[in-house]
């Protein structure tokens, strides 16, 4: 995206507002476009520590004041705040898609309970299995949910591993589920805008 500002200038287009989804947003992109004087409205992916911190620590309540009208199909709530993003304090909007939040939470809880039952069963029935085969089985069971579990290996003891839910990761996932971050250079825009 940062290459677009010089190209637009080459065509004589010197000002305006660029709008894009969160996939192309980086500190370099934002600062370059701001340097060229462009207004921005963009999503910010939950990849950087700054973005994750903003989203996870911002409470977006589902009350009338935070409701964003988007027709009959969606339940969106948003709050505006000032937070450090891309190296400086900026006005940002955190919005909550209540339907997505509820679906993510239900699906994750179901999966974590399913994995927990499988781990318990594996512990109870590990006799005759080598540690290596148990490690392989655990890898297959945990897959994309590994960060939600803490596994400890115990030498010369049965069961040969212990496990527990990683509540810190679970809470972080819960606090970011269905929530998204938006940034606009125009500070006159409201959360609803």
Protein language model annotation of sequence segments:
Residues 1-193:
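Anion-binding and metal-coordination hotspots
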């Amino acid at each position: 995206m940062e290459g677009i500002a010089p190209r637009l200038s080459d065509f004589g287009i010197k000002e305006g507002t660029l709008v894009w989804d969160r996939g192309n947003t980086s500190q370099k992109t934002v600062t370059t476009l701001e340097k060229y004087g462009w207004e921005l409205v963009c999503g910010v992916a939950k990849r950087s520590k700054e973005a994750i911190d903003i989203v996870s620590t911002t409470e977006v309540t589902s009350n009338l004041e935070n409701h964003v009208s988007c027709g009959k199909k969606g339940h969106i709530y948003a709050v505006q705040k000032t937070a450090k993003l891309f190296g400086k304090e900026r006005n940002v909007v955190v919005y909550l898609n209540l339907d997505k939040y509820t679906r993510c939470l239900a699906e994750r809880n179901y999966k974590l309970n399913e994995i927990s039952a499988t781990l318990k069963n594996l512990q109870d029935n590990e006799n005759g299995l080598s540690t290596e085969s148990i490690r392989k089985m655990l890898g297959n069971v945990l897959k994309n949910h590994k960060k939600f579990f803490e596994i400890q290996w115990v030498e010369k003891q049965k069961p040969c591993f212990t496990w527990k839910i990683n509540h810190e990761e679970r809470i972080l996932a819960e606090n970011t589920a269905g929530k998204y971050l938006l940034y606009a250079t125009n500070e006159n825009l409201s959360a609803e805008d």
